[in-house]
Amino acid sequence: MGGIVFYRNNYSADLSRSDRYYIEDGSSKPSPSGKYLNRNECLWGYVEFGDGVKKYTDKAYCSVVDMTNGCIVSDWDGEACGYSWVGNKDVLASSGGVNADKFDFQSMCPVINKIIDDFSGIDEKDIANLIRCDSPSKENVNTYQRMAKENKKAKRVVLKSISEYLSGITEISTVKTKSNLFTLPNDNNKTSAYLVPGDKVRVIQTSPDNKWINIGYINAKGSPLISWVRTETLE
């Protein structure tokens, strides 16, 4: 059983799944631009049917990988696995005809802010892929903070990605008075935690009314914390 590993510059990521096998037979093709790879895979194992009977099965799957970051953009089975790249655009279709069925794989790309379920049940592999597809930014870093609290198995990898994001923020401010921490920019979401005068924080963004600042703080142990504070508590 083969595997699939993504390499780019000094970064690598194992994209394999333990319940699938990977055989390169020439059917996995890059898109016209070279940005995506349409990869064919097989699922193997025993599947339990409605009557309680377990049967061994092989099932074909296809996944599109973004070759710029290793993101598995979409993962599916069925008829769409027979689709191929057409023309000179990154379009998957049943044929090159004008009325051919097209598969909108890009709409399936994982986005953390679109996840409505509890984060605790998400597999570590899926979270690692989510980070590759939708890395921490000012739009989603607060959601990643919540994920780190709710999913203990993936806490380490999520906090690492948050730390990497914060390291790229150049705007730094200093706490001037005791600063209570809030999960959202309003008084109803106050936590028991706080920062003390002299603490250094990285400024992520300011609320529209300028009364709150979204900050990132890295404690003495190197663990990141994302929170909201009142603007007047910072220098």
Report the location of each language-model feature.
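Short consensus segments that form the blades of beta-propeller domains
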Residues: 1, 48-57, 192, 204
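Multi-bladed beta-propeller domains
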Residues: 11-24, 70-79
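Residue-level detector of Asp-centered blade-edge/turn motifs that repeat once per structural unit
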Residues: 32-33
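Short glycine/acidic-enriched loop and turn motifs that connect beta-strands
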Residues: 43-49, 98-103
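Boundary regions of SH3-family modules and the immediately adjacent low-complexity/disordered segments
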Residues: 153-169, 216-235
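SH3/SH3-like beta-barrel superfamily modules
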Residues: 194-232
